C-alpha cells in the first residue's frame, strides 16, 4: 500500500473514531441531563465559541499553509519555524483578547444565540459560555497546529484531534451529573 493510501486509510479511521465519540458525547449528554435547561445551556455554550472561532480558525489554517510553504522555500526550515512561532503567538494574543471581550459581553452574546432562554436556563447558559469562551486560545492554537501538521504531511493527528476533546466532554458530563452541573464547563478547561 502506498504512503498516500495509508494516510487516507488512517485519516478515515481517525475520522470514524472521532464521529463515533461525538455520537457518544451526544448520548452521554442526553442520558445525563435529558431535554433540560442544563443540556440546552451546555449546547449553546459549546456552540458559541465554535461559531465565533471556526470561521476565523479555518481561515487562519488556510492562509497559514501557503505562507509557511513560501517562507520555507525561500528562507529555509529555521525561518519557517520562526514564522510558525510568530503566527502562533499572534493567534494566542488575539484569542486572549477575544476571550476577554467575549467574557465581558457574554450576556449579550448568549441572548443572540439563545433566543427564548429565560431564568435559570439563561443564567446557566451565560455562566457556561463565560467559562468556555476562555478556551478560545486553545482553539486557536489547535487550528495553527493542525495546519502545521498538514504542512508536514501528517494528516492523521489532525483527524484525531476531536477524539480527546470528545472523551473529555463525556467524562465531564459523567462527573458533573454526579457532583454538580456547574462543574461541566470547568472540567472542560482542565
Task: List where the protein language model places each region.
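Membrane-embedded alpha-helical bundles of multi-pass transporters/translocases
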Residues: 1-190
Amino acid at each position: 500500500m502506498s504512503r498516500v493510501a495509508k494516510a487516507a486509510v488512517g485519516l478515515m479511521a481517525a475520522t470514524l473514531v472521532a464521529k463515533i465519540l461525538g455520537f457518544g458525547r451526544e448520548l452521554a449528554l442526553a442520558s445525563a441531563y435529558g431535554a433540560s435547561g442544563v443540556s440546552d445551556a451546555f449546547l449553546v455554550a459549546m456552540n458559541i465559541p465554535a461559531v465565533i472561532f471556526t470561521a476565523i480558525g479555518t481561515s487562519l489554517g488556510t492562509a497559514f499553509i501557503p505562507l509557511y510553504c513560501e517562507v520555507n522555500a525561500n528562507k529555509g526550515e529555521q525561518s519557517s519555524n520562526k514564522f510558525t512561532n510568530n503566527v502562533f503567538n499572534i493567534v494566542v494574543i488575539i484569542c486572549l483578547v477575544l476571550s476577554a471581550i467575549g467574557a465581558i459581553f457574554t450576556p449579550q452574546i448568549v441572548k443572540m444565540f439563545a433566543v427564548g432562554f429565560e431564568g435559570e436556563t439563561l443564567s446557566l447558559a451565560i455562566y457556561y459560555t463565560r467559562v468556555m469562551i476562555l478556551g478560545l486560545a486553545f482553539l486557536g492554537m489547535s487550528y495553527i497546529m493542525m495546519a502545521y501538521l498538514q504542512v508536514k504531511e501528517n494528516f492523521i493527528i489532525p483527524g484525531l484531534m476531536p477524539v480527546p476533546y470528545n472523551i473529555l466532554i463525556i467524562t465531564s458530563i459523567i462527573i458533573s451529573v454526579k457532583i454538580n452541573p456547574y462543574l461541566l464547563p470547568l472540567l472542560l478547561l482542565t
